[in-house]
Amino acid sequence: MASEKNLDDFLIKQNSRVHLSDRKLANLVREAYPIGVPALIMKSSTDRMMDSSGYSFILGTPDELLRNLASWLITNAGNTHKILLKLIDRLWKRHGREDIALAAILLANLDHKGMGSDPWDILEKSIHPMESVDSLLLNIEELLRAKRPPPTQEQMLDLKSGKKIKQHMSLMIIYAATLHGHKFSSELINEIMSIEIPEGDSILSRIKGKISSLEGQT
């Protein structure tokens, strides 16, 4: 694929010392996102999604290119992924859609055992007071797809007692993790289902309804 070759050509040219700086890596990936994305597609995606998404930019970078970029970052990170943890923090602060998608892939695939880190704790600390459902589900789905266990009951209850955005994230985790075959106690599900959602929020209402349906099947 031409766009993948273009990305490979771009990455080959990078100085290996770039991996020592999360700031330089953040600049590098921002430069890499548009590779292989036609300008008209970029403009169309931005015009269509920007107003309601909460993202600072949307370029339309294909998922496969983001995965290739994440693989290159992890492969060249050396013996520790601590710089990549700092990069994840920078990506969330910049908050382009490609930033959040790349952060999700990185978060799911870093060596958390070696660093003594917990991906769910990192995600909780990364999110902004207002986030789109898309940005949260990108991360939740990526962690579950990578076979990461869902948050513990204690972590889930902490989310439930937190700010609204964290409460809403706990609902999404229950739903997505249940679809991936994980089981939660009835007590925990009842606690999470007691969360109040904004009137007229059709997405969260549907998620609540689907959780109820899934519970009825067990």
Residue ranges of model-derived segments:
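Alpha-helical scaffold domains
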Residues: M1-T218
